[in-house]
Design a protein with these regions (language model features):
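Terminal, non-catalytic protein-protein interaction segments that mediate quaternary/complex assembly
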Residues: 2-287
Length: 287
């Protein structure tokens, strides 16, 4: 058990604040809650496993590579790349501020579980059209993350992760599998070009307590760890982090509803095989 007795009461958001932010997806607000939990001196001391590299560090690494002309050609395109990249997602962007209007539309599409890009509310971005199938089942993709974790077809990954945490809050089996062994074939079916980037998410609950109003109260802090083979640090990260924060909040809300114990998310932790930006976004490193 992590002893957070000395943490000031106001470091922990009220559950009403927390609950209201789930559907709002206002990352400035969301990350303020996360900051109270993850970057407080007391929390870092209590949880020594927190990553020390954050989004500013990743930006500085990319900037140094850009200044040194350390450019790689990946699939015919000039890129700046950081391989085997591990960092704390303490901000909702790394290189360029997010398009919140689109991020909300993509979140709605994920929640619909549709595997067709034309079902994205509003207009369908060019990048989704380019990777979707071009014959037979036209417009189909693999990477609807809502389908990946909420659908029966992919094994109800979210429910199994939540059930594992409820059954044993110290479990190491609370995992959501996004990818599948057939992806090498599925990614190019019917002219598609969609080899899913995320392959799994693992969740841990850290049991904590604090003293408030002369009583000891037990609660949990969720560690939500993402594993990806590849991530575009502009189009990918900016939208992915909104999605993962939504899922982390939903996990905490559902865990609390089922157990009666309050749970709060900390920052998302990212592990990426290839974290990169393309040449069209190099200009954002000149600021």
């Amino acid at each position: 058990m992590i002893d957070l007795t000395q943490i000031k009461y106001n470091l922990i958001p009220t559950f009403e604040e927390f609950d209201n932010s789930i559907e709002d997806i206002n990352l400035n607000y969301t990350f303020n809650i996360g900051k109270r939990l993850s970057t407080s001196k007391e929390w870092n001391n209590a949880n020594s496993n927190m990553l020390s590299i954050d989004t500013n560090d990743i930006y500085n690494i990319l900037k140094k590579k850009y200044d040194n002309n350390d450019i790689r050609v990946i699939s015919g395109s000039n890129c700046l790349e950081v391989q085997n990249c591990h960092f704390l997602a303490d901000k909702d962007y790394i290189v360029r501020e997010p398009n919140y209007e689109y991020a909300k539309r993509e979140l709605a599409w994920y929640k619909s579980q549709s595997l067709y890009v034309d079902d994205i509310p509003g207009f369908t971005p060019k990048i989704w059209k380019e990777v979707s199938s071009t014959c037979n089942d036209i417009g189909k993709i693999n990477s609807n993350y809502g389908w990946c974790i909420f659908s029966n077809e992919n094994g109800n990954q979210y429910r199994k992760c939540l059930d594992a945490l409820i059954k044993d809050n110290s479990t190491r089996q609370a995992v959501m599998f996004y990818n599948r062994p057939s992806m090498h074939v599925d990614s190019v079916k019917d002219g598609m070009h969609d080899f899913m980037c995320t392959y799994q998410v693992q969740c841990f609950l850290n049991e904590c307590f604090y003293l408030g109003d002369a009583k000891r109260e037990r609660f949990f802090i969720l560690r939500y760890i993402v594993y990806q083979r590849s991530q575009d640090l502009v189009f990918g990260y900016d939208n992915d982090i909104l999605w993962h924060n939504y899922v982390a909040y939903k996990l905490c809300k559902d865990f609390t509803a089922k157990t009666g114990y309050k749970a709060y998310p900390s920052y998302i932790e990212c592990n990426v095989g290839s974290a990169h930006i393309y040449e069209r976004h190099f200009k954002f490193l000149n600021k």
